[in-house]
C-alpha cells in the first residue's frame, strides 16, 4: 500500500515501501514456506506485512483505496462539467482542500480502470454503503439538522486523527 499519484519507473523512489503495508493474499493450498519467503522479501523492502483472504482484502481496499480514487475522479469531473463561468472560478479558487482531495485523480487512468473492473463486486458494495451515508448527510443538510452533521463530523474527525496517529496517512 504505497506510491503516489505518479506512475512509471521515473516516479519511483528508494523508500517507497518503507513503513507501508504489503498485504499478501495467498489462495487456499498455497505452500506456507512460499508465503513466509514472500513476507520476508517485502519486509526487506521496508514493508509491514499482513496476510488476508482475497475476498476480505478486496472489501478492505475497496473502501480504503478504490472508493477514494473513484470519488476524486468524480469530483474533478463534476467541477469540469459546470457552466463555463463557474468552471473558471472553480479553477481560480481551488484551494488546498480541493487540491488535497483530488490529488489522486492524477493517478494512472488505465490502472484504475482495471482495478475497478477487477474488483467490481467489492467496489459496488462499498459504493452502495457510501451512497447511503452520503444520502443521510444530504438529508441532514436539507432539513437543517446541525446536530447530526456535527456528530458525524466530530466522529469522523477522531477517526481521521487515529489514522494519522497510526502513521498510515
Task: Spell out what each predicted region is.
Residues 1-2, 56, 108:
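Residue-level detector of flexible, active-site-proximal loop/helix-junction positions
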Residues 1-10:
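Rossmann-like NAD(P)(H) cofactor-binding subdomain of soluble oxidoreductases
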Residues 10-16, 114:
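Short, flexible, solvent-exposed loop/turn segments with mixed acidic/basic and small polar residues
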Residues 16-103:
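Internal alpha-helical scaffold of NAD(P)-dependent oxidoreductase catalytic cores
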Residues 87-155:
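Interdomain hinge/lid region at the active-site interface
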Residues 158-169:
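Long, positively charged, glycine-interspersed low-complexity recognition regions
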Amino acid at each position: 500500500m504505497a506510491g503516489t499519484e505518479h506512475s512509471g519507473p521515473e516516479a519511483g523512489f528508494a523508500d517507497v515501501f518503507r513503513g507501508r503495508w504489503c498485504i499478501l493474499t495467498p489462495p487456499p493450498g498455497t505452500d506456507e514456506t512460499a508465503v513466509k519467503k514472500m513476507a520476508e522479501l517485502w519486509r526487506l523492502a521496508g514493508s509491514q506485512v499482513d496476510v488476508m483472504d482475497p475476498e476480505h482484502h478486496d472489501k478492505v481496499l475497496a473502501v480504503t483505496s478504490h472508493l477514494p480514487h473513484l470519488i476524486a475522479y468524480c469530483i474533478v469531473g463534476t467541477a469540469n462539467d459546470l457552466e463555463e463561468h463557474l468552471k473558471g472560478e472553480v479553477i481560480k479558487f481551488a484551494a488546498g482542500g480541493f487540491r488535497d482531495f483530488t490529488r489522486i485523480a492524477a493517478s494512472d487512468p488505465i490502472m484504475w480502470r482495471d482495478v475497478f473492473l477487477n474488483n467490481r463486486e467489492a467496489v459496488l458494495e462499498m459504493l452502495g454503503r457510501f451512497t447511503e451515508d452520503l444520502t443521510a448527510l444530504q438529508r441532514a443538510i436539507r432539513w437543517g439538522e446541525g446536530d447530526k452533521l456535527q456528530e458525524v463530523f466530530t466522529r469522523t474527525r477522531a477517526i481521521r486523527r487515529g489514522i494519522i496517529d497510526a502513521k498510515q496517512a
